[in-house]
Design a protein with these regions (language model features):
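Positively charged n-region of N-terminal signal peptides that target proteins for export
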Residues: 1-5
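Bacterial N-terminal signal peptides
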Residues: 6-16
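Solenoid-like repeat scaffolds
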Residues: 45-50
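Short helix-capping/linker turns of helical repeat alpha-solenoids
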Residues: 51-56
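Alpha-solenoid helical repeat scaffolds
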Residues: 57-59, 91-92
Length: 413
């Protein structure tokens, strides 16, 4: 029998003197699928005493997991499938959900609502994480975390398998295919530094959603939507779907759609305030990354660290070293990013002799035209004189991070 919300809250209240322990255990149990789904224990943790920092942290973790799960459920419901070649740069359409044999129709307006709901869910997770104080710790096995995308508890997706699939170019596992194996044991001990880190990721994801919702991309959706969602709304054009007498095939049409999609990326601004909000969220991401590192560098323990300091050796992630020079390089890179977002430094363009003011791109937005940005024409209204981050800045960032800038940026946030 599944415990009631009242019972969960009562068990936490009874053990309040133990502070984070029982609440952390409840959060870990929910994350690992050993108890009720994310939402019910998150509500119970919200009802815990104000001083229970394990409850605050656990609620934030569960709300983040629930946000990702709800977004994945929406993608499954509408049959999200393998991104076509050349369209993998669309980050919110790369979630490898199982194939849905009976997808529902999807309109442009419904897709915007899905993104808005994801943004709202991330905001709730971030708000809970922002209340965490002290140094609570939640220990759990990342590979035991499962997400229910299909509505069938028997088909929950393990986080480890999800990560493994995303490493395979975001290709979902088709019916009958073997699941790629994730790590067998991925135990972590999330602490205060990780609470700040996850807040930052909430902001980073939210910035991308704010950018999308700031623009009208309905034409692009109409062109390429069917390649992602089988029943997406599209113009009634009699395209070839199989080989015809001229040798043309449906696959040739897929390539043509990608070309048309790129041409259609000239998105009008429909909600300009969201562009300013995206900039603020990016600045918050930078501030939280700094705060996270300040906390990490002050830690004296050493237990299954998600992001270890140079002095911590028991790391849950071991694909890249964390040395004093790497940390210093990352913090210096954050300074450049912040300067660009504030307009203190300009951003260079391969074709222009001046830099452009990135802050004004957000605060004084114009239609986003991908081709014109690539050619430099779209940067013209924002050109200015001043210190500029050009290609040498990229080389410097990469050198400071041991040649692995992108990997560290994804990990460190």
């Amino acid at each position: 029998m599944r415990p009631s919300l009242a019972a969960l809250a009562f068990s936490i209240a009874l053990s309040a003197p133990a502070l984070a322990g029982p609440s952390a255990d409840l959060a870990a149990s929910a994350l690992e699928g050993r108890g009720p789904a994310f939402e019910q224990p998150a509500q119970a943790l919200r009802a815990a005493p104000a001083g229970d920092q394990g409850a605050r942290f656990g609620e934030g973790l569960l709300l983040f997991a629930r946000a990702v799960e709800r977004y994945g459920q929406a993608q499954y419901r509408h049959g999200l499938r393998v991104p076509p070649a050349g369209a993998g740069f669309l980050p919110f359409l790369r979630m490898p959900v199982p194939i849905n044999p009976s997808p529902e129709p999807l309109s442009y307006e419904a897709q915007r609502k899905t993104l808005a709901a994801f943004l709202d869910d991330l905001g709730k997770a971030k708000a809970a994480l922002a209340t965490v104080e002290g140094d609570p710790k939640i220990r759990f096995d990342m590979n035991a975390v499962t997400l229910d995308f299909t509505g069938d508890p028997a088909r929950r997706v393990r986080l480890g398998d999800l990560v493994a699939q995303m490493q395979m170019a975001g290709r979902p596992t088709r019916p009958g295919a073997a699941q790629p194996a994730g790590p067998q044991d991925w135990r972590v001990a999330f602490d205060r530094g990780d609470a700040l880190w996850l807040q930052g990721y909430c902001n980073l994801l939210s910035a991308g959603i704010e950018f999308a919702l700031a623009h009208d991309w309905s034409e692009s959706f109409g062109i390429l939507g069917r390649q992602f969602y089988p029943r997406a709304e599209a113009a009634a054009i009699p395209f070839v779907t199989a080989r015809d007498g001229r040798g043309m095939t449906g696959a040739d049409g897929d390539i043509a759609d990608v070309v048309a999609f790129i041409h259609s990326i000239r998105w009008p601004v429909v909600e300009p305030k969201r562009m300013s909000a995206a900039r603020e969220r990016l600045l918050e991401t930078i501030a939280l990354s700094r705060a996270s590192w300040k906390t990490i560098l002050a830690e004296t323990d050493d237990e299954r660290e998600w992001i270890p300091s140079p002095d911590q050796k028991d790391a849950a992630v071991t694909f890249a070293p964390v040395t004093p020079s790497i940390v210093d390089g990352w913090l210096a890179t954050l300074g450049d990013f912040e300067a660009a977002l504030k307009g203190d430094k300009l951003v260079g363009h391969w074709r222009l002799t001046k830099g452009f003011d990135l802050s004004k791109v957000f605060t004084q937005p114009r239609p986003f035209d991908l081709v014109l940005w690539a050619s430099g024409h779209a940067a013209a209204p924002y050109l200015a004189d001043g210190p500029t981050l050009d290609s040498t800045a990229w080389r410097r960032w990469n050198a400071l991070l041991g040649g692995g800038f992108l990997g560290y940026a994804i990990w460190f946030n």
